[in-house]
Amino acid sequence: MSQLLVRPHEPDATGCVLEVTPQSAGWAHVGFKVCRLAPRQELTGGEADRETCIVVLNGSAHISINDVALGLVGGRSSVFDDVAPGAVYVPAGARFLVVAETGLEVALCSAPGRPGRPARIIAPEAMSREVRGQRTNTRYVRNILPQTEAADSLLVVEVLTPGGHWSSYPPHKHDNAVLGQETRLEETYYHRLNPSQGFAFQRVYTDDGDLDETLCVKDGDVVLVPRGYHPVGAPHGYDLYYLNVMAGPERKWIFRNDPAHEWMLLKR
């Protein structure tokens, strides 16, 4: 199996079904973990030198930071609902406790950080929704933790791509630091499909061809994007959801399109 593809496993004692660490991915910044909890099951975490964005993918949970209760977070029944997820920002140096109110799927998105920022619930109205692309390139984006919102390293966004459409397209990359033109960001894609027996395709490739892999993605898979362009295609009949986590030396999302395919942006 490709080293860029991480598949889920049965829940362990903590409910974890999938985990990506900087060590397992072979990079320096992004961490990602998915847990599925039964009602009243607890999940704890927090790191001295890493910030975390808790994203309640579906279900609801009571969340506390350093023993301070933030309240009930979440509530949507599926990632395919067109509503914002529940989300909480946890600064580096803080501890969190998640107690499932219902059956729960939660993502823990992490990256390097410094202690001192306040913990907070990310309000649904703060998560801007936008429509990108047109015709069979149309997809629906919700910015959970964009660069306009306070954090040290993390960028978090979710995207719904209708069946038969493309996403992260035309192909773009963000693997080189060029002032004002491109930033260097690692990225994970957490994929869900509806219906769940479906599949999607994601290609990860570089200009020089040193990296060029096309991956068949199933429900619950993660694709690692250490570098290169990374377009996604959803077959007819299967809607695709993905949660992106990005982080790098600079907290800005500035990308460069593949010049071979940039022409289509000029053709309206």
Task: Name each model feature, range by range.
Residues D81-E101, A111, C216-G237:
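Conserved metal-binding segment of the jelly-roll/cupin
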Residues R192, Q197-R268:
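Acidic/histidine-enriched, beta-strand-rich ligand/metal-binding domains
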Residues F32-R36, C53, A87-Y89, L108, ...:
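Conserved hydrophobic/aromatic beta-strand scaffold that supports enzyme active sites
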Residues L104-N143, Y205, L243-R268:
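Double-stranded beta-helix
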Residues P11-T44, E51, N137-T188:
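A short glycine-rich, His/Asp/Glu-containing loop-to-beta-strand
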Residues G31-V99:
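Extended, compositionally biased flexible segments
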